[in-house]
Amino acid sequence: MSYKIVTLPTYRAVGLSWEGTFSDIDPDLKNVIKQSEDRADELVYKVNPGVQLGLNYHVIENGFAHYAVYEVSEEQELPNGMVEIRVPEWTYVKTTHNKGDNIQQTYMDLHQWLFDSDYTAFKEAGVNYYDPYMPIKHEHYPVNSDPNDPHFDIYIPIVKK
C-alpha cells in the first residue's frame, strides 16, 4: 500500500448527512448514501461529478457524523433537504482502498503507517472526538464504485508530531 502527503484547498460540498452509531450503518447510512446518489442531478455545479465524497467525523460515542456529498462551486444553490459543509485547507495522508481488499485491514495498515510516521491525525480545536487515532476520515468514491465491494481514496487530515 502506498501513502502520499497532499494538501487540498478549501472546498464546499453539498449533499445529505447522517449521524448514528456503528450498529445503525446498515441500512440507515447506506440509504442516505443512495439517496445522495439519486439526488446528485440536483447539483448542477459539481466540481468533480465523477466522485462522491464520504466525509466522516467521529463526534458521536460509538458512531460518527457522515456527509454523503459532492464538491460544488459557489454558484450552487442549496437544494431543499440538503446540507452544506465547508472543508478547510488541510494536509492529508492519502491512500487507496482497492476493490477486493478488506476495508478494516486497509484502515489498520493506515493506522500503523501513521504510528510509524512523523505525523499524527489532525483534530479541530474545541471538538470532542471519540476516535483518538483517526477522528476525521474523508473517502472519495468514484460514482461507478460497487457499494458492496468499493474502491476509493482515503484522506486523513494530519499534522507533524
In which residue ranges do the predicted regions lie?
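A solvent-exposed interaction/effector surface
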Residues: 1-161
